[in-house]
From Swiss-Prot:
<comment type="similarity">
    <text>Belongs to the PsaJ family.</text>
</comment>
<comment type="function">
    <text>May help in the organization of the PsaE and PsaF subunits.</text>
</comment>
<keyword id="KW-0603">Photosystem I</keyword>
<protein>
    <recommendedName>
        <fullName>Photosystem I reaction center subunit IX</fullName>
    </recommendedName>
</protein>
<dbReference type="GO" id="GO:0009535">
    <property type="term" value="C:chloroplast thylakoid membrane"/>
</dbReference>
<dbReference type="GO" id="GO:0009522">
    <property type="term" value="C:photosystem I"/>
</dbReference>
<keyword id="KW-0793">Thylakoid</keyword>
<keyword id="KW-0472">Membrane</keyword>
<keyword id="KW-1133">Transmembrane helix</keyword>
<feature type="transmembrane region" description="Helical">
    <location>
        <begin position="7"/>
        <end position="27"/>
    </location>
</feature>
<keyword id="KW-0812">Transmembrane</keyword>
<keyword id="KW-0934">Plastid</keyword>
<keyword id="KW-0602">Photosynthesis</keyword>
<keyword id="KW-0150">Chloroplast</keyword>
<dbReference type="InterPro" id="IPR002615">
    <property type="entry name" value="PSI_PsaJ"/>
</dbReference>
<dbReference type="GO" id="GO:0015979">
    <property type="term" value="P:photosynthesis"/>
</dbReference>
<dbReference type="InterPro" id="IPR036062">
    <property type="entry name" value="PSI_PsaJ_sf"/>
</dbReference>
Length: 41
């Protein structure tokens, strides 16, 4: 169990989880608020 916890705390695994979570959040924001990056003038 200690080896699994050591593996899950390595940088590539944490980076993959972080970027996956960030991508999911951005996708959901764009799903509910589309075209938020375009200023409506």
């Amino acid at each position: 169990m200690q080896d699994v916890k050591t593996y899950l705390s390595t940088a590539p695994v944490l980076a993959t989880l972080w970027f996956g979570l960030l991508a999911g959040i951005l996708i959901e924001i764009n799903r509910f608020f589309p075209d938020a990056l375009v200023l409506p003038y």
